[in-house]
């Protein structure tokens, strides 16, 4: 058995793969097993009772994690004039218009979040086939198409996490780092679950939040009892 294989097996020890753990106990198990040589990301996965193939069952939104993600995002803003200056002052890493479009079309995407003023969207729309599949296309529903570019930049830098349901009815997202204090992770998890709960679409039928699990980058998954997560 390889060294990696042994570590995986050891990390799974003591975890009941069927049991629904209270969220605080699950976080403890995750932190204890996050033993990689880097600060592992703690991730949440939620199985929802929706079929995103139907427009009235799409789940999408953004949540501002109270304690951030522990990751520094590179933010790009499509804007001109005063709004471009505003974005730079707020801490945007890249700001541009036609020049930034050309850069992206040339294959360089040096950012993790993309924001645009409404007047820039006809221009940014040309990048749909490039930004869309990467989840980077600005969208007014999650606050990334806005005149308040300063607020959007600060939110992105401060812990704003976008979420969108995938084909199988699953939503995944980062809720912090394994090095975070337990209480901070619990607060972030509660905020994420609450945001998804509030984004329940009208077309959802039956049990909306069906399963929730936590894991770290290199660690095993731990199923949690959704009833123990409170915002």
UniProtKB/Swiss-Prot annotation:
Role according to the record: Binds directly to 23S rRNA. The L1 stalk is quite mobile in the ribosome, and is involved in E site tRNA release. Protein L1 is also a translational repressor protein, it controls the translation of the L11 operon by binding to its mRNA.
Descriptive protein name: Large ribosomal subunit protein uL1
NCBIfam families: rplA_bact
Keywords: Repressor, Ribonucleoprotein, Ribosomal protein, RNA-binding, rRNA-binding, Translation regulation, tRNA-binding
Assembly with partners or alone: Part of the 50S ribosomal subunit.
Short name of one Pfam family: Ribosomal_L1
InterPro entries, A to Z: Ribosom_uL1_bac-type (IPR005878), Ribosomal_uL1 (IPR002143), Ribosomal_uL1-like (IPR023674), Ribosomal_uL1/biogenesis (IPR028364), Ribosomal_uL1_3-a/b-sand (IPR016095), Ribosomal_uL1_CS (IPR023673)
């Amino acid at each position: 058995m390889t060294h990696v294989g042994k570590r995986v097996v050891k990390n799974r020890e003591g975890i009941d793969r069927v049991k629904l753990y209270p969220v605080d106990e699950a976080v403890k198990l995750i932190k204890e097993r996050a033993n990689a040589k880097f600060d592992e990301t703690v991730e949440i996965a939620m199985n929802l009772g929706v079929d995103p193939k139907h427009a009235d069952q799409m789940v999408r939104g953004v949540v501002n994690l109270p304690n951030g993600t522990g990751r520094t995002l590179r933010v790009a803003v499509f804007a001109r004039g005063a709004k471009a200056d505003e974005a730079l002052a707020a801490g945007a890493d890249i700001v541009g218009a036609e020049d930034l479009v050309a850069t992206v079309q040339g294959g360089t995407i040096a950012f993790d979040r993309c924001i645009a003023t409404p007047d820039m969207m006809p221009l940014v729309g040309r990048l749909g086939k490039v930004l869309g599949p990467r989840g980077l296309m600005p969208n007014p529903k999650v606050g990334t198409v806005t005149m308040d570019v300063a607020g959007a930049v600060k939110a992105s830098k401060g812990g704003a996490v976008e979420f969108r349901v995938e084909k199988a009815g699953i939503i995944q997202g980062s809720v912090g780092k394994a090095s975070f204090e337990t209480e901070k992770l619990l607060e972030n998890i509660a905020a994420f679950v609450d945001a998804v709960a509030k984004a329940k679409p009208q077309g959802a039928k039956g049990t909306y939040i069906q399963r929730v699990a936590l894991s770290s980058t290199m660690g095993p998954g731990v199923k949690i009892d959704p009833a123990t997560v409170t915002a």
